[in-house]
Amino acid sequence: MSKSIVVGYDGTDGGHHALDEALRVAAEIGGDIVIVYAYDKILSGGELADLDAVVKERGVAILTEAEGIAAVAGITARVEFVEGRPAEVLVEVADACDARFIVIGSYGDRPLKGAIVGSTPYKLIHLADRPVIVVRIPD
């Protein structure tokens, strides 16, 4: 098993806390991190295509920010911008790099939706075959 840590990052408070924890653990074990921004494709056509372009642009900016945070912390990081459902994407990336852990915030930008239809962390802990660290967001 590698010393890589996969972290789900979306630029929200939950994402920032997850990234901080991934960086802390990576420093402790002498590992690196893979920062993943996963997004569900928006249906194409007309204004929806424009929205999809905005989502992609935002994702690139968010990953650039995260890569800079890792560099300041002195941790080697690579970024993955992947279309797909976040829990499934995080598992696929973790499997591909034989990650030691997956780190994710307890919620992103829609905590109520997660409570109703099932959150990404909930799905992730049931799909992953490796430890998942769910970082609680302080009140």
Language-model regions: role of each:
Residues S2-A49, A53:
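Small/aliphatic-rich secondary-structure junction motif
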Residues E21, V54-A66, V89:
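Short, solvent-exposed amphipathic alpha-helices that sit
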Residues G31-D32, I75, A99, R130:
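Short glycine/serine/threonine/alanine-rich loop segments
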Residues V36, R78-V82, I133:
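General small-molecule cofactor/ligand-binding pocket signal
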Residues Y37-Y39, G105-Y107, R136-I137:
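Short secondary-structure boundary segments
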Residues G68-I102, Y122, D139:
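Structural beta-alpha unit
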Residues F101-H126:
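Glycine-rich, Arg-bearing micro-motifs that act as flexible, cationic patches
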